[in-house]
Amino acid sequence: MAEYDADVPAGIVMTSMEAIVGWLRKTSFWPLTMGLACCAIEMISYGGPRADAARWGHEVFRASPRQADLMIVSGRVSQKMAPVVRQLYDQMPEPKWVISMGACASSGGIFNNYAVVQGCDHIVPVDVYLPGCPPSPDMLIDAVFKIREQIQHWPLMGHMSEVEAAKEKKALDAKTTLEQKGLMR
């Protein structure tokens, strides 16, 4: 339970600015329209009336990376598309988050060849991995709620750039999905 200060009048709520901004950000962020394969169909149905993304404040998918703060990489990423994905990520304003949607985006899926990137974590830092082929809109809703939890506790101003740089370095230095194959044997 919260402690109440006797000096504060009734009806006054005391909180931090980071808590307010975190709450506002998590209830209104803008996903980037970026469908690369069949997972994009499930991502599109996430915005439809059955899943109803508008309940959580993400009713509009943005076509411009400069207006988006959530990238959903849905589907396989070819070697030719990889620089475009990175360029779109770099054009997004800070803070920004990434969901890797589906088996192809997370690990290359069934396409284990030279033409497909074996996981978009080789290109951009990923915050949430969403398994499945293709994952359902309900699974995407769960991933969005995990992102919302991260957004709620994101630092405000000050050391935000250092936190973002550390997050990207940690993600890009981590063991890739290609190196992790065979760990379940």
UniProtKB/Swiss-Prot annotation:
Species per Swiss-Prot/TrEMBL record: Cutibacterium acnes (strain DSM 16379 / KPA171202)
Cofactors (names): [4Fe-4S] cluster
Name of the protein this chain belongs to: NADH-quinone oxidoreductase subunit B
GO biological process, one term: electron transport coupled proton transport
Function (record text): NDH-1 shuttles electrons from NADH, via FMN and iron-sulfur (Fe-S) centers, to quinones in the respiratory chain. The immediate electron acceptor for the enzyme in this species is believed to be a menaquinone. Couples the redox reaction to proton translocation (for every two electrons transferred, four hydrogen ions are translocated across the cytoplasmic membrane), and thus conserves the redox energy in a proton gradient.
InterPro entries: NADH_UbQ_OxRdtase-like_20kDa, NADH_UQ_OxRdtase_20Kd_su
Cross-referenced NCBIfam families: nuoB_fam, PRK06411.1
Pfam families for this protein: Oxidored_q6
Cofactor note: Binds 1 [4Fe-4S] cluster.
GO molecular function, one term: iron ion binding
Positions contributing to [4Fe-4S] cluster binding: C38, C39, C104, C133
Reactions catalysed, as given in the entry: a quinone + NADH + 5 H(+)(in) = a quinol + NAD(+) + 4 H(+)(out)
HAMAP family in UniProt: NDH1_NuoB (MF_01356)
Quaternary data: NDH-1 is composed of 14 different subunits. Subunits NuoB, C, D, E, F, and G constitute the peripheral sector of the complex.
Family: Belongs to the complex I 20 kDa subunit family.
Keyword Cell membrane: yes
Lineage of source species: Bacteria, Bacillati, Actinomycetota, Actinomycetes, Propionibacteriales
Keywords annotated in UniProt: 4Fe-4S, Cell membrane, Iron, Iron-sulfur, Membrane, Metal-binding, NAD, Quinone, Translocase, Transport
This enzyme's EC code(s): 7.1.1.-
Chief location: membrane
Membrane topology, as annotated: Peripheral membrane protein
Protein localization: Cell membrane
Root EC class: translocase
An example Gene Ontology CC term for this record: respiratory chain complex I
